[in-house]
Amino acid sequence: MMTPAPIVVEVPGTRSDAINAMVRNKLTGLPVVRSSDGMLMGVVSRRDIFRNIGEDQLSLIMKKGCITIAPDATVQEAARIFSGKRIHRLPVVEGGRLVGIVTPTDVLKLVKDMKTTMTAEDVISTTCVTAYEGEPLTYTIPAMRVSDVSAVPVLDAHGNLVGILTDRDLFSDQMKDSEAIKELGIEDVGNLAGYRNVLPLFYSATEKYQSDDRLVKDFMVKDPMTVFSKTNLAEVAKLMVNNDFGQMPVHGTKDELIGMIYDVDVIRVLAGNPDE
């Protein structure tokens, strides 16, 4: 299930090293290894850089003492870690050295083919942060950062779901903000798909370039794909894997928005009873 010999970034290193590695490889996070001997030192994600945008040294940005798993661990063990800790990268370590990595998508591929009676409403467990379609991005983006979410359902004046805003949607004209891109040290500005993976960093570093006339409705995905509270988790997993979604809005029996379901929520179906 794991990806062997994953892409890494090394320490000593800089913020720009991590950002450019994410952009080139269309990733949102990376294991960090020591350049001298390849020992795992931590992990770094776009959110880590997002929270420490003024820091340049990778050793001060990355998460140290990260949770790891052994090569012979079971899928159930991995599922328990993902759902319990709500993390999105699980380094596989042997003798202190990185030998692979597991992500929620790897586990979701197993869930989509399983038979289960569990549904979306059985695993929704987090507070749902929403945005109003008419509010400026200068308000929404800091709110997303404080709430530590990468996607928000968007509502109209009547409380109806009209869209979803993710960090990948917050880009309109990369050349317009070329100076801000330089501030982040991004080299491969032509790699749009990879660039979108670090958009939270872009908007954090470039708040001084933002104006109040950029509204949520101009950047959101309209009429997003949703699931219902009674949707089977295998079907939710299939939708996520097939569409490269990390989260989806959930509707109730009266078609009202009741929350968001995340990949790490769906994985709970494989976690079993912690006492087993």
Question: What are the residue ranges of the model-derived segments?
Answer:
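Tandem CBS (Cystathionine beta-synthase) repeat/Bateman regulatory domains
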Residues: M1-E276
